[in-house]
Amino acid sequence: MDSYVIQTDVDDSLSSVLDVHVNIGGRNSVQGRKKGRKARWDVRPSDMSNKTFNPIRAIVDNMKVQPNPNKTVISLSIGDPTVFGNLPTDPEVTQAMKDALDSGKYNGYAPSIGYLSSREEVASYYHCHEAPLEAKDVILTSGCSQAIELCLAVLANPGQNILIPRPGFSLYRTLAESMGIEVKLYNLLPEKSWEIDLKQLESLIDEKTACLVVNNPSNPCGSVFSKRHLQKILAVAERQCVPILADEIYGDMVFSDCKYEPLANLSTNVPILSCGGLAKRWLVPGWRLGWILIHDRRDIFGNEIRDGLVKLSQRILGPCTIVQGALKSILQRTPQEFYHDTLSFLKSNADLCYGALAAIPGLQPVRPSGAMYLMVGIEMEHFPEFENDVEFTERLIAEQAVHCLPATCFEYPNFFRVVITVPEVMMLEACSRIQEFCEQHYHCAEGSQEECDK
């Protein structure tokens, strides 16, 4: 009689086939070890996915709170200027997209780093005597977020570290840690309009530091560094031989009483990868077109970093071709009045919000100079029923239906961030509700009754 004997190795969870013994017509044979996959399904998420962590999502998604149903929700939390419809892009920008689409020229693949003609336009737009640019110095990306990702990936290896601001945009940590790159936090100083604590910054640098991330103008702070402060940052980077990743997506989005200086315009010796895009200045974040500007006047990056960026860009075959086709018209034909009107609105809202919140006992807003944000300190000793900024903002939602992001999302507890792109009437209403909320929960600190009686 024919027979089959299968020998297996059994442990607590999995079994695998070792040998197959076959008897056919009285003749024995061993078919040998069965190699290949294990006998049981074992599909697990990658290490990269397990290391990927978004602080904003982790905090916001765990807020188990419903807004007051008797009030209309006012969201001051979303950094998307298109949400309320009050800040449309310029008609010239929209027409440029229509023309590119109607032309039928941009339906295929482009080079992974972008069309040469589109890169020439970006280089021409940002070229200046202090920081000259050519098309070879431009990499087009799928939004500024991908630009930042490519820069981190080309500059840092797993086990190295990067320096990022606190408070700062959470994406830096999310991207770095997913790649096995350590994050070190340097402090911004609210009492100095969020300037960098340069001494503390320099103390963090070691032999494994791959780059310094500088975000100017700042999300979440709305701060804009002075020329003098930028020069001091460059001096630290030059002393320590650390390249800079400059996140300048809010470049030129500064208020009339302030001046924006691109970091590369001030740098002779420090190599800089500057990240920008259409999202914020042109108010089209969903169009997903960003860029990397390579500034390397001393040829410190050499060909290796440039070639590395090209190779990394080939992973997704480049950004949207239709937007690239519209880029020349967008950069050349958007009227100055559009930029002026946008900034005038943002400054008006910033002044309104700052003035209203500064008058509320227990709050300490920091006046912004640009971008789309304002940070507000909470004097927690006057709100003892709340343990931290997360609880404060949760109750603000529950009672007043006003949604602000707790600054724990940006590694800076006991502050919250306000987005200033909402319509003016909505901003006024939000500030009024925040005032009512604070008045209901404010308590005099011990020994300060005189202040409360004022």
UniProtKB/Swiss-Prot annotation:
The keyword Transferase applies. PROSITE patterns: AA_TRANSFER_CLASS_1. Homodimer. It comes from Rattus norvegicus. Its cofactor is pyridoxal 5'-phosphate. Liver. Gene3D superfamilies: Aspartate Aminotransferase, domain 1, Type I PLP-dependent aspartate aminotransferase-like (Major domain). Transaminase involved in tyrosine breakdown. Converts tyrosine to p-hydroxyphenylpyruvate. Can catalyze the reverse reaction, using glutamic acid, with 2-oxoglutarate as cosubstrate (in vitro). Has much lower affinity and transaminase activity towards phenylalanine. Pathway: Amino-acid degradation; L-phenylalanine degradation; acetoacetate and fumarate from L-phenylalanine: step 2/6. Belongs to the class-I pyridoxal-phosphate-dependent aminotransferase family. The modification N-acetylmethionine is found at M1. InterPro entries: Aminotransferase_I/II_large (IPR004839), NHTrfase_class1_PyrdxlP-BS (IPR004838), PyrdxlP-dep_Trfase (IPR015424), PyrdxlP-dep_Trfase_major (IPR015421), PyrdxlP-dep_Trfase_small (IPR015422), Tyr_aminoTrfase_ubiquitination (IPR011715), TyrNic_aminoTrfase (IPR005958), Tyrosine_aminoTrfase (IPR005957). The lineage of its organism: Eukaryota, Metazoa, Chordata, Craniata, Vertebrata. Its EC number is 2.6.1.5. This is Tyrosine aminotransferase. It catalyses: L-tyrosine + 2-oxoglutarate = 3-(4-hydroxyphenyl)pyruvate + L-glutamate. The modification N6-(pyridoxal phosphate)lysine is found at K280. The modification Phosphoserine is found at S448. One of its GO terms (biological process) is amino acid metabolic process.
